[in-house]
């Protein structure tokens, strides 16, 4: 009997304790931001940052406290493959980009992101049109376990997405000139002249959205990394987008891509951009691109050889005419291709290099046997990952960034001597005529 009474007392005490435990209601709302970065294989969502109105303890949070699920929407009326993301790490901080702390009002959720990670894309591939389109990036975050605050209260929230932010990409502004849409990065004005780097995207990143070409690979953002800013002395970066394809036509097996020749408009766009940004050093204008962007690099050089200090066509989709090389012989080139490229024959770049040398040009040619990053095989055409990560070096050990940053045209100065001679001759003739009278 005493035993039963003891159980009753214990049960009542436990019930009273549980009722007194301060548990916050689940209808409390808080917001999270999504973050994405551009990798060798394109832009991927890699982080969630949750902001709380109260501080929570780090030791009350584990990976299984949250579920993160992509809920992206197509902008081209295609079905989207969504699903749960793998949480790689989770920690508490005192700011959105802060370090791990014992307590704070920000929860940083780092998501697994690699070449084969599912549901992480910010672009959607459309095979029939051979092009990417931007996704409407949306995620759902669910808190499945309560957390403890610094006041030792358990708290549970309903989470709502706020902003979608992209590292480096958000540092670019957008514009349009001569019918060419572009993204661009401008360094802070400091009264000095800075180089201009022009990046031309490949097939599949064209359109009128002004976003896929900057998210498809590191093409533009590579040149605004901290390393690039230091090597290039804070460059301007211009990333134009073709409305469809740079090339009028390209055959890829049974697939025929038909585009529009906008070379004259592109060059006009570049000149206009330089006129609008007086901080650009006209003796340090560099142009390059990959695949179809490599083709457009060559065409821009032929259209305006006086404009560029150096160029870097990468795995260019172009059998470059040998008889046109003479006009480019004074422009240093860095040409890159992979030997096993199954999209564009490596012979295109080999021939371009040899013909350029025969015309008297100076070029660095780098050929990789394949494309492999950290032991993982990439698509054989994607040789641009090496120069964009500044991992390409010439025989002397000079990196691609170092080589490009060292190129400079001779400043164009006006030769006044012929005018002075003519002026003196005319003045002398007038003086002689007056004396004769």
Regions found by a protein language model. Give the residues of each.
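Active-site machinery of serine-nucleophile hydrolases
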Residues: 196, 203-264
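Primarily recognizes the serine-hydrolase "nucleophile elbow" in alpha/beta-hydrolase
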Residues: 274-327
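A domain-start/cap signature at the N-terminus of enzymes
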Residues: 26-51, 62, 70-194, 410-411, ...
């Amino acid at each position: 009997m005493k035993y039963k009474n003891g159980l009753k007392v214990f049960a009542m005490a436990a019930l009273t304790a549980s009722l007194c435990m301060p548990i916050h209601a689940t209808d409390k709302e808080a917001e999270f931001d999504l973050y994405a970065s551009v990798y060798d294989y394109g832009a991927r969502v890699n982080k969630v940052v949750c902001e709380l109105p109260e501080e929570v303890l780090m030791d009350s949070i584990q990976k299984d406290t949250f579920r993160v699920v992509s809920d992206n929407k197509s902008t081209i009326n295609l079905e989207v493959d969504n699903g749960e993301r793998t949480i790689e790490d989770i920690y508490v901080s005192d700011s959105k980009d802060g370090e791990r702390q014992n307590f704070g009002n920000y929860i940083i959720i780092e998501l697994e992101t690699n070449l084969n990670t599912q549901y992480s894309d910010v672009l959607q591939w459309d095979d029939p049109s051979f092009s990417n389109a931007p996704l409407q990036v949306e995620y759902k975050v669910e808190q499945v376990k309560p957390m403890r605050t610094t006041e030792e209260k358990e708290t549970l929230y309903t989470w709502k997405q706020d902003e979608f932010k992209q590292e480096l990409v958000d540092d670019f502004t957008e514009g349009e000139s001569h019918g060419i849409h572009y993204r661009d990065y401008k360094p802070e004005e400091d009264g000095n002249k800075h180089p201009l780097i022009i990046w031309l995207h490949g097939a599949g990143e064209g359109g009128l959205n002004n976003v896929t070409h900057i998210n498809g690979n590191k093409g533009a953002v590579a040149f605004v990394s901290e390393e690039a800013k230091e090597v290039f002395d804070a460059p301007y970066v211009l990333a134009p987008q073709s409305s469809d394809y740079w090339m009028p036509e390209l055959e890829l097996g049974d697939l025929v891509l038909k585009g529009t020749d906008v070379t004259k408009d592109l060059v006009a766009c570049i000149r206009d951009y330089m006129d609008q940004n007086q901080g650009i050093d006209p003796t340090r204008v560099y142009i390059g691109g990959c695949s179809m962007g490599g083709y457009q690099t060559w065409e821009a050089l032929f259209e305006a050889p006086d404009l560029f200090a150096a160029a870097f066509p990468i795995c260019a989709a172009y059998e470059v005419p040998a008889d046109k090389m003479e006009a480019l012989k004074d422009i240093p080139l860095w040409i890159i291709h992979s030997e096993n490229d199954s999209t564009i024959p490596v012979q295109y770049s080999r021939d371009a290099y040899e013909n350029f040398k025969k015309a008297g040009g100076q070029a660095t040619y780098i050929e990789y046997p394949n494309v492999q990053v950290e032991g993982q095989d990439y698509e054989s055409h994607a040789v641009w990952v090496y120069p964009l990560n500044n991992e390409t070096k010439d025989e002397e050990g000079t990196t691609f960034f170092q080589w490009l940053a060292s190129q400079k045209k001779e400043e164009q100065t006006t030769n006044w001597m012929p005018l002075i001679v003519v002026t003196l001759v005319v003045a002398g003739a007038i003086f002689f005529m007056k004396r004769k009278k």
